[in-house]
């Protein structure tokens, strides 16, 4: 398995691997909520956000153009609690990811405190690379092609 070193500036740009590998430096990434960006192959990506304590109804995913935005707004706690130690954070957040061209949200699941967003690259057939078969002419075909009396040249 490969690890891709994305600079902090481009951590939220998904599908721009060549661009990301050429850029250096950047800004501090957002600390909450923690998330992973996984690349399983050239056409499949997954964003996983750790959202312990959130309910599915408190989360919203929106795609507008190339921007994927994930928002969370926890419901207020009815009874105030005095924490001796607070390690779990439940605060409002908004994360925006910039998706590469032809990268679309395929699926989203919230399970065991993790929000998984699956992305799929779907390049139209007309834009995909084409393989051209290279053939070799038989000796008889070569004579026809090299002949000055070929039917095309009259």
UniProtKB/Swiss-Prot annotation:
UniProt subunit comment: Homodimer. Forms homomultimers of about 100-150 subunits at optimal growth temperatures. Conformation changes to oligomers at high temperatures or high ionic concentrations. The decrease in size of the multimers is accompanied by an increase in chaperone activity.
Subcellular location: Cytoplasm
Domain sHSP: 26-137
InterPro entries associated with the record: A-crystallin/Hsp20_dom, ACD_IbpA/B, HSP20-like_chaperone, HSP20_IbpB
Gene from which this protein is expressed: ibpB
Domain notes: The N- and C-terminal flexible termini are involved in oligomerization and in the binding of non-native substrate proteins, and are essential for chaperone activity.
UniProt source species: Yersinia pestis
Protein name: Small heat shock protein IbpB
Family stated for the protein in its record: Belongs to the small heat shock protein (HSP20) family.
Pfam families associated with the record: HSP20
Source species, domain of life: Bacteria
PANTHER family found in the cross-reference section: PTHR47062, SMALL HEAT SHOCK PROTEIN IBPB
UniProt keywords, alphabetically: Chaperone, Cytoplasm, Stress response
Entry keyword Transmembrane: no
HAMAP family: HSP20_IbpB (MF_02001)
Gene3D superfamilies: 2.60.40.790
Function of the protein: Associates with aggregated proteins, together with IbpA, to stabilize and protect them from irreversible denaturation and extensive proteolysis during heat shock and oxidative stress. Aggregated proteins bound to the IbpAB complex are more efficiently refolded and reactivated by the ATP-dependent chaperone systems ClpB and DnaK/DnaJ/GrpE. Its activity is ATP-independent.
GO BP terms in the entry: protein stabilization
One GO cellular component, as annotated: cytoplasm
Main location, first listed in the record: cytoplasm
């Amino acid at each position: 398995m490969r690890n891709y070193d994305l600079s902090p500036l481009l951590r939220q740009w998904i599908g721009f691997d060549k661009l990301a590998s050429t850029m250096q430096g950047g800004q501090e990434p957002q600390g909450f909520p923690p998330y992973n960006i996984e690349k399983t192959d050239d056409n499949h990506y997954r964003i996983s956000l750790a959202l312990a304590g959130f309910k599915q109804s408190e989360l919203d995913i929106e795609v507008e153009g190339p921007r994927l935005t994930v928002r969370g707004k926890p419901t207020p706690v009815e009874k105030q609690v005095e924490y001796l130690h607070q390690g779990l954070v439940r605060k409002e957040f908004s994360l925006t990811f910039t998706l590469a061209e032809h990268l679309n949200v395929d699926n989203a699941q919230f399970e065991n405190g993790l929000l998984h967003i699956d992305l799929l690259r779907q390049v139209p057939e007309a834009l995909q690379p084409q393989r051209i078969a290279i053939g070799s002419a038989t000796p008889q075909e070569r004579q026809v092609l090299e002949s000055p009396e070929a039917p095309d040249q009259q």
